[in-house]
């Protein structure tokens, strides 16, 4: 693990790559005995892991080790008045699981009330969510699409999926949705989606939006995000993807609407980008997009 935080709130993280990590850690915890405990006869400097809100021990900062400084789950250790170790969250943590299980399983809302904070962040930073979704996928999100995604995010309670975090709000926004019609969808040129549409024989015409095209075909095809995946590699890096499918109506089934796959592909996404973006000071807000969030993303009861 390459970063830590200090509470269960959604807050800026402290990265081990920060040259002043030790000083910042000690300034933050002060003389709070909860963060420095004797565990099995050894002093442990503790914090929380942002992905699962479980206690972690800091390694390589206060005692030399053979690898770069990092954090590791502190199984069974509690930080008084901050957090209790949770085995269920540990089992679901990407840095324990190493791979996503692709199941849209819900967390019990009584167990993780901070999920309401996640929902609040999605609403307050919805223009950044849309911006990053566009940037990483190449899909131009119109205001109508932004409305549909906001409404679906609330209906599906996507903020309450087991793997949902502050980091992957943009990906869960589209992953929780059933799919958009490709007809007249606007796509940025030279992206993965653009290339796959060309390979599948879709007719793409230049859009009025610079550097983009739109899909001219109207055969009922959809673009749907089928999976959000992650793998933690041997260097402790979290690699993430969105899996997409292009599907079209099955012409052999006439009595109901069913689809068949035309193509499948994956797009790499960077979750760390969003956590940095929400703290960016010089952001130019898109008020129309924020107004959509205000209309559709009402306070949770």
What are these regions (language model features)?
Residues 1-113:
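N-terminal cysteine/histidine-rich coordination modules
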Residues 1-8, 116-124, 232-238:
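Intrinsically disordered, low-complexity N-terminal extensions of nucleic-acid-metabolism proteins
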Residues 7-8, 23, 38, 53, ...:
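Residue-identity detector for threonine
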Residues 15-17, 138-142, 261-270:
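Helix N-terminus capping/helix-initiation residues
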Residues 40, 45, 70-73, 96, ...:
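Histidine (H) residue identity feature
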Residues 74-186:
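Domain-exit/linker segments immediately C-terminal to small folded modules
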Residues 147-301:
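Intrinsically disordered, low-complexity regulatory regions
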């Amino acid at each position: 693990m390459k970063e830590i935080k200090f509470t269960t709130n959604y807050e800026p993280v402290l990265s081990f790559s920060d040259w002043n990590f030790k000083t910042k850690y000690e300034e933050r915890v002060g003389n709070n005995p909860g963060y420095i405990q004797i565990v099995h006869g050894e002093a442990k400097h503790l914090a929380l892991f942002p992905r699962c809100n479980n206690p972690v021990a800091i390694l390589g900062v206060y005692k030399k080790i053979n690898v770069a400084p990092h954090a590791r789950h502190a199984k069974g250790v509690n930080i008084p008045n901050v957090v209790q170790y949770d085995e269920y969250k540990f089992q679901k943590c990407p840095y324990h699981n190493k791979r996503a299980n692709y199941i849209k399983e819900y967390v019990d809302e009584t167990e993780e009330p901070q999920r309401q904070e996640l929902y609040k962040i999605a609403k307050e930073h919805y223009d950044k969510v849309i911006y990053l979704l566009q940037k990483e996928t190449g899909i131009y999100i119109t205001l109508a699409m932004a409305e549909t995604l906001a409404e679906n995010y609330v209906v599906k309670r996507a903020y309450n999926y087991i793997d949902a975090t502050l980091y992957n709000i943009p990906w869960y926004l589209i992953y929780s949705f059933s799919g958009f019609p490709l007809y007249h969808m606007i796509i940025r040129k030279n992206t993965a989606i653009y290339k796959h549409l060309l390979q599948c024989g879709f007719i793409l015409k230049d859009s009025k939006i610079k550097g983009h095209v739109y899909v001219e075909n109207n055969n009922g095809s959809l673009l749907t995000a089928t999976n959000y995946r992650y793998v933690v590699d041997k260097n402790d890096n979290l690699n993430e993807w969105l899996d997409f499918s292009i599907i079209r109506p099955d012409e052999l089934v006439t009595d109901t609407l069913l689809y068949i796959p035309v193509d499948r592909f994956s797009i790499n996404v960077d979750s760390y980008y969003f956590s940095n973006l929400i703290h960016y000071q010089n952001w130019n807000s898109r008020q129309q997009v924020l107004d959509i969030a205000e209309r559709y993303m009402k306070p949770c009861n």
